[in-house]
A protein has these predicted regions:
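Core catalytic lobe of class I
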Residues: 1-10, 14-318, 323-325
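Conserved SAM-binding loop
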Residues: 328-329
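Conserved phosphoryl-transfer catalytic core
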Residues: 76, 333-339
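Charged C-terminal helix
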Residues: 324, 340-341
Length: 341
């Protein structure tokens, strides 16, 4: 497996020490414009990007960037620049979760789909208890000119690879390995014992088409079978964690594209766009491996970092406002992180 500690420290060594903070060994906060800061990150070194950029449509003056653009197109152009950098720094088997408003959802997806396969659009509902449901109960319904936006969106995506939604980095690699050692999909299926119910290529053809992924045990069988035929040592086989996009859910998690998490209740020093830890943990647990590197390019008060630490991941947080950088540092220094893995 890739030496994540080495990769993590190598990434951090590229940042100016005057703007880099390490409140914990596996949590780093970098102050500055994340669009510029990302240029210092080596290509294909981040496992998961979980981030909450300005929504633009909400037009809140207390959120940096929310009132920056007068035209929608200018905001979308700006976000497209982020998408280009996200794709460059993300591992081939990495994933992204990007928060957005329901009003800008489709326009953003149109831009993101140039570089990413859109795997899901998650609707985050907010089943808050009475008294903690914001303006939903208090507002005058007769003044509404559209349906009240009681939910938010999270676009879940992975780097585009090929011309089809299901094409994957692993599928393309498996096909190229087979061609190098001259073994058919049918023969490899027989050797691994992974028979398909429909097509004659069995599971191998499904894996190459991106309709399914092998288990860890199946991947080991694939590699062993290919190594026997790779007599000239032409192929360098990556570990499972470095080629298979993680997606790990179970019955204890929210596993549909509707997520029900209460919002963060008001407290002194709360970030105006703060997201709940349990929601962030749901995404991190599903789409990363233990010890992976999680990046948040709009980190606010450091919630993503706290969630990542609780699950045994490393985090890099980027924040442009000094006020929130200091709040994040204080938060991560003082918070007793309880590992949940």
């Amino acid at each position: 497996m890739m030496n994540t500690n080495k990769v993590y420290n190598n990434i951090l060594s590229n940042f100016n020490t005057d703007t880099l903070y390490r409140p914990q060994k596996d949590a780093a906060i970098v102050e500055g414009d994340s669009l510029e800061l990302m240029k210092k990150i080596p290509s294909h070194s981040i496992s998961l990007i979980l981030t909450d950029p300005p929504y633009h449509s909400t037009n809140k003056k207390n959120i940096t960037g929310d009132t920056k653009f007068k035209k929608d197109e200018d905001f979308l152009d700006w976000m497209e620049q982020f998408a280009k950098e996200w794709k460059r720094i993300l591992k081939f088997n990495g994933s992204i979760y990007c928060f957005c408003s329901s009003q800008m959802e489709y326009q953003l997806i149109n831009r993101f789909s140039k570089d990413f396969n859109i795997l899901s659009t998650i609707t985050w509902t907010k089943p808050n208890k009475p008294g903690f449901d914001g303006w939903r109960k208090k507002m005058k319904k007769e003044n509404l000119r559209q349906w009240y936006p009681a939910s938010e969106r999270i676009v879940f995506m992975a780097p585009k690879y090929g011309e089809n939604l299901f094409n994957s980095y692993f599928g393309a690699k498996l096909r190229s390995w087979r061609n190098l050692v001259k073994i058919s999909g049918h023969d490899l299926t027989e050797i691994t014992g992974a028979y398909g119910k429909v097509n004659h290529g069995g599971a191998v053809s499904n894996w190459e088409a991106g309709r399914n992924i092998p288990s860890r045990e199946q991947y080991t069988k694939i590699i062993n079978a290919l190594k026997i035929r790779d007599t000239n040592g032409l192929i360098s086989f990556p570990d499972y964690e470095d080629i298979i996009r993680p997606f790990n859910v179970d019955g204890t998690m929210q596993y549909t594209d509707i997520w029900d998490f209460e919002t963060v209740r008001q407290y002194r020093g709360k970030h105006p766009a703060e997201k709940p830890i349990d929601l962030l943990e749901n995404a991190i647990k599903a789409s990363s491996y233990v010890n992976d590197i999680v990046l948040d390019t709009f980190s606010g008060s450091g919630s993503t970092a706290e969630a990542a630490l609780s699950l045994g991941r490393k985090s890099i947080s980027m924040e442009i406002e000094d006020k929130w950088v200091q709040a994040s540092v204080d938060r991560l220094k003082s918070t007793q992180i309880e590992l949940k893995v």
